């Protein structure tokens, strides 16, 4: 999965480096692999799995940069299940929600409450732009990115 993600532009370079450093050691790689497998394929409610995944990422070995960031905890499920899961870039998403008039419940500490709020925001956007026929949450994420980015 780390190789798959490295082919995207979803994570900033400092996040990619922090992840690579975290999984260099056998124990870091094992912790990451088991945690990611449980998050993607484990049993139980998504909220509980998400919280466990955040704990795993928070426990990964680190050098200088923190590994536990919103982009890092959301990117892998977004790649694996774009029909139902979305990716969070905090600044852009917060600005997009503000522009959209959506009360996005954001916390800088990754956790289920914020992610559940993001999924609600995605559902609202999907409903509102249904005539544009978004195929999945990649399309919704793209819409959010354009709305919240000052580049467009």
Q: Where are the model-predicted features located?
A:
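Cytochrome P450 catalytic-core helices
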Residues: 73-78
């Amino acid at each position: 999965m780390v190789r798959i993600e490295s082919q995207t532009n979803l994570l900033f370079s400092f996040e990619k480096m922090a992840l690579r450093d975290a999984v260099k050691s056998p124990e870091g790689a094992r912790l990451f692999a088991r945690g990611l497998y449980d998050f993607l394929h484990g049993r139980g409610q998504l909220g509980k799995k998400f919280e466990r995944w955040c704990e795993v990422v928070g426990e990964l070995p680190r050098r200088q940069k923190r590994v536990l960031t919103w982009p890092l905890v959301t990117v892998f499920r977004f790649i694996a299940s774009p029909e139902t899961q979305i990716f969070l870039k905090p600044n852009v998403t917060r600005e997009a929600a503000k522009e959209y008039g959506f009360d996005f419940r954001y916390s800088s500490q990754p956790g289920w409450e914020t992610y559940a709020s993001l999924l609600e925001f995605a559902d609202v956007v999907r409903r509102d732009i249904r005539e544009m026929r978004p195929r999945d949450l990649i399309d919704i994420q793209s819409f959010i990115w354009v709305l919240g980015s000052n580049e467009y």
